[in-house]
Amino acid sequence: MKIWTALRNAAKGWVLLLRGDAGWREQFTRSAAGLATALAIFIFVVFLAVIIVAIGTDIPGLFAILAGMFALSLPLVSMALVLAGTRMALGVAGPTYDVLVPGTYALMGFIVVEGLLASLFGGPIVVVSWLALGYLLYRLARAATGWHTGISIGFAVLTVLLLVAMRQALYMLSSIAGSPS
């Protein structure tokens, strides 16, 4: 099955990337089709995460499912925005598929790990998943783009900060919208 092959290759690719092996690129389909596959799997993982959270409660409506999927998709949005901003600031036309495809698979793992940590241990321990995500994004930026250490660290830190800021803004907006006036 193509989905399982893509996930297995992504896991192999990330292991190779973290080891510093140059063969990590061959494990990912770094093209529009590869990005479409990664996004389809990402959407499925996000949908499953929303449904799993709702198992202990009532069946959510369509709007609640879509809102949950939107909130869980913020890591992907933040990575894409920071990548575009970094490329624009540097004035380079670097390899976007080299970052977006492996990054999408890493964010799938992040969503799963963050959800497990939040449900098992509570809020403050979730910071560990943010730190792990930052490290993965740093290593990805170094390997995929050849950016200097400082730029790669900046990319990773800005992506995680934007993710946290967007979630906080969404939380504040939802509490304002839900409060009686």
List the model feature ranges, each with a label:
Residues 2-95:
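Selected alpha-helical membrane-embedding segments in polytopic membrane proteins
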Residues 32, 36, 57, 61, ...:
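Residue-level signal for alpha-helical context at structural boundaries
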Residues 40-49, 114-118, 170-172:
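Short, charged low-complexity intrinsically disordered segments located at boundaries
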Residues 52-54, 121, 178:
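Low-complexity, flexible helical/coil segments
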Residues 67-68, 122-124, 167, 180:
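A short, structure-level motif marking secondary-structure boundaries and short turns
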Residues 83-162, 168:
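Hydrophobic alpha-helical transmembrane segments and adjacent short intramembrane/lumenal linkers
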Residues 165-181:
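Juxtamembrane boundary at the C-terminal end of a transmembrane helix
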